[in-house]
């Protein structure tokens, strides 16, 4: 497909949150998706999702059903700061800025999970982010001491609504006080690889340098990115890891 046709590619991406309730055992815990909340005891959280407004001058609540198109520019290139969050200036970058607020009365540790379709990662090439069809990222500020842990894979594969996903997680290492929001986002957005195209047979392809490879996923059907957050009481624990280990909350909320 020529460059002109690439410009009209548009895939609906529904960056949704799907609810899955975890066990609570004897500890106060809470879970939250973008639209659903389960509360147990004195811990309560809100998963906040935001995007830049049309003028790119302020953050506003995230809206579903974005058009996902190949990125123009680089997500690691020129950045801008909007409401304290560093974000890529690249065109066709889809903001999904995820923070968590402690809306309860007790200090709490929090963590977040993101599910990405397995078929949109790594293709037939070595396991490295540069070979993803669908990319996602967080800025370096979130890796500072006391902020978010490095991203880990907690499950692969997991089937959600008939689609195979790989589940990623990050944990906020500092306990959140009542009404406090994580100082940095866990994730800031998603983007389609700049080489994504459609061939003459209608197959979606990606090219990482060795010619187009067919993607084993029909992007015409859209992409769902489930997101899930968990919280556990901080009282009695010296670290987020210890608190979540004792809580009994599932490490894969969609299992």
Predicted regions, residues:
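Hydrophobic membrane-insertion alpha-helices, especially the h-region
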Residues: 10-21
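N-terminal Sec-pathway targeting helices
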Residues: 1-11
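Surface-exposed, hydrophilic segments of mature proteins
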Residues: 8, 27-255
